[in-house]
Amino acid sequence: MQIIHEDPKEGKVKVKAETLDDLWHLYHIIDEGDVVYAKTLRKQSQRSDSLRAEKVEVIPVFLGVRAEKINFHKFANQVRVTGPIVYASREDVPLGKYHTIAIEEGTVVTIQKPRWKEHHIERLREAVSASKRARVMIVVIDDGEADMALVREYGVEILTSIRHNLGGKRYNTDREAEEKRFFHDVAKTMEEIMNREKVEKAIVAGPGFVKEDFYKFLRENYPELVKKVVIEDTSVTGRTGIYEVIKRGTVDRVYHENRVAKEVQLIEKVLENIAKNNGLVAYGLREVEEAANYGAVETLLVLDELLKGEMREKIEELMDAVRYSRGEVVIVSSEHEGGEKLKALGGLAALLRFRVK
């Protein structure tokens, strides 16, 4: 994300969305009641006289829309903001009519808020910082099968699976030839994805020796690619293996600032403390509020969905209270496994400095 201009007096920030991750951040920055300004296309009815049929044309126009609905369409790569028009650059566009602004990669948009809250500012800074960071690719590989995923700012995106039938015995000549074809297929797919997505690092993981064989193959055949590869063990393959890599902290070690890795590990710490029954965790609104009142919250985990729901004001007050007592607030994406686990706990959890019971 690129910040183009800030106008604190008017409560306006003009930004350019550069990636899919930026769209995810904007979805959480824009609230109901905000005014969103952008260049857009609008259908306009034209009639030259009463005898002629009404003609509809699409016109380019700069609009300001007061947000009533904000939707993130991951597969269309869009954030859609719908609401009444409050500003139009053309006089023939009536104010008060409803319009949807589609924010895509490359869209320049101005957001105006009555008040920019701390979590909005934090997310904006994070989006700008994230745009300078490389994302991480995970490849879980075993006999004739490889699953690839991209760790994005909003969660884990499963990209593709590659399957080759390698046949029987491990040292059979035909098998070795097919394995080489499989390795070439995986390597070329990795290169294509890493170039397209501008990924600087790939974690190659798996339960057996195949990952080491693949690494050796890369060293001999893809010397530039192998420089970007880190090897890791997993106990399983497939999607479960991908999440195991994240839980082990490998993504964090490879790129220590990665948001998803941090969120998943914090949720695992919460679950670990619950299992230990050590009193150093609270979850659910009542328990977390009580811990915050004592100043006991070291890290507050908030599911992003709560900041779009009816409890938003109450949650924001809780976040402010935790920050006041020098606790850390982490907004957890609902788009990954850790977010699903937090949702099962009511969407709120806290790691505590000391026991309150």
From Swiss-Prot:
Gene Ontology CC annotations of this record: cytoplasm
EC number: 3.1.-.-
Location(s) in or outside the cell: Cytoplasm
Keywords carried by this UniProt record: Cytoplasm, Endonuclease, Hydrolase, Metal-binding, Nuclease
Official protein name in the record: Protein pelota homolog
Coiled-coil ranges per UniProt: none
Gene, per the UniProt record: pelA
Domain notes: The N-terminal domain has the RNA-binding Sm fold. It harbors the endoribonuclease activity.
